[in-house]
């Protein structure tokens, strides 16, 4: 905590710390995969359900992983009960919807999966998902956790182009506005 010179009050500072972990595929260990019990129930949040159900951009299919397929123009996402909580589910769905705005029939972003371009697209999706999460009033903790994987690429790009973050924020804002328009137009 530091004292604010103008008010004299103590203020807390948050300092992000990047940690590394060794991760192994469960098949490379003698452990058994943890599975959520069948009794685990994650209750949907009605305002989030209404919002996402009102968007008519691409198909949303149940799958084992969350991703957007630009080739087939659909979102795959596990059932809400596979997530630790509803906020994580909706933040992930928001992230994939932001990706879907990059399709050629929508905003037409370059969605090449070469590492630098893909890292930029991920930054757009992370920022856009934060915008949607804030709009819906849900916690964006998972978004922050996912962003650490791309942090090194983003910092390198920011060093090379100081406007990198602002450009990504502009693209994320366009994607967010596009989704809001789709949501409003289908109600």
Features from the language model and the residues they span:
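N-terminal accessory/interface modules of nucleic-acid-binding and processing proteins
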Residues: 1-187
């Amino acid at each position: 905590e530091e004292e604010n010179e103008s008010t004299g009050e103590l203020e807390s500072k948050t300092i992000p710390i990047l940690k590394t972990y060794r991760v192994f595929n469960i098949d490379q260990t003698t452990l058994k995969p943890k599975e959520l019990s069948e009794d685990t129930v994650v209750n949907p949040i009605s305002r989030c359900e209404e919002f996402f159900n009102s968007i008519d951009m691409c198909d949303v299919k149940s799958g084992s992983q969350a991703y957007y397929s630009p080739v087939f123009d659909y979102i795959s996402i596990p059932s809400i009960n596979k997530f630790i909580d509803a906020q994580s589910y909706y933040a992930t769905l928001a992230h994939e919807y932001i990706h879907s705005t990059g399709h050629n029939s929508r905003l037409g972003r370059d969605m090449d999966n070469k590492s630098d371009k893909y890292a930029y697209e991920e930054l757009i999706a992370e920022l856009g998902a934060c915008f949607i999460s804030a709009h819906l009033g849900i916690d964006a903790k998972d978004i922050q956790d996912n962003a650490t994987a791309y942090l090194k690429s983003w910092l390198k790009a920011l060093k090379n182009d100081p406007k990198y973050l602002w450009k990504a924020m502009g693209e994320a804002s366009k994607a967010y506005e596009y989704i809001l328009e789709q949501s409003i137009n289908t109600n």
